[in-house]
């Protein structure tokens, strides 16, 4: 799989990435002041062009998680995760029951703008299609890694080497 992290992409950039056979486009809300509605529009274009939309949120908040997932974003990244309690909160916000407690609306892209007759199946399908990625960037998170990995509903884990290096005064040391 090939992907790219984009700080400030345009719709044309997204189309060029699709033509270049990228699989994943990672949009950044942690270090880029892009409006959420614009990120959702870009995410929909990414998905419609056959790529996977990934968005790193600036902080753990219901507003960011709910709006992005309802808008059709496929992978949400939580940066600077510190412990399993934060991971559990992320899952509660990002997954529907029985895994989490995400709020449900039938007027969303992810729900196909309708619930249909099989609402339980819709929730199962949405949970299966939604990926929650946690990013650890500190010694504290590393020390609690086993507890974090045991949280049901956390789908992927990565680390942020730059912030971690800054946090332990190693940035720039080679």
Where are these regions (language model features)?
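Glycine/Thr-rich beta-alpha phosphate-binding loop at enzyme active sites
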Residues: 17, 159-174
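Conserved anion-binding
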Residues: 63, 75-152, 161-166
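Alpha-helix N-cap and loop-to-helix initiation/capping positions
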Residues: 34, 82, 173-174
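Non-catalytic positions within long, well-ordered alpha-helices that form the structural scaffold/packing
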Residues: 18-19, 69, 149-150
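Conserved N-terminal beta1-alpha1 strand-loop-helix module at the mouth
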Residues: 1-53, 57-60, 92, 132, ...
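Generic hydrophobic/aromatic pocket-lining and core-packing "Φ" positions
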Residues: 14-15, 39, 43, 65, ...
């Amino acid at each position: 799989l090939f992907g790219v992290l984009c700080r400030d992409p345009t719709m044309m950039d997204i189309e060029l990435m699709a033509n270049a056979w990228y699989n994943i486009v990672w949009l950044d809300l942690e270090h880029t002041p892009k409006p959420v509605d614009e990120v959702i529009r870009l995410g929909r274009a990414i998905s419609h062009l056959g790529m996977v939309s990934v968005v790193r949120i600036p902080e753990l908040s219901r507003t960011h998680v709910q709006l992005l997932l309802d808008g059709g974003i496929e992978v949400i990244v939580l940066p600077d995760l510190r412990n399993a309690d934060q991971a559990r909160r992320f899952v509660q916000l990002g997954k529907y029951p029985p895994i989490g407690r995400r709020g449900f609306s039938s007027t969303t892209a992810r729900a196909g703008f309708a619930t249909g007759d099989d609402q339980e199946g819709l929730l199962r399908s949405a949970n299966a299609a939604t990926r929650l990625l946690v990013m650890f960037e500190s010694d504290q998170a590393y020390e609690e890694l086993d507890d974090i990995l045991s949280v049901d509903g956390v789908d992927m884990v990565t680390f942020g080497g730059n912030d971690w290096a800054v946090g332990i005064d190693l940035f720039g040391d080679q």
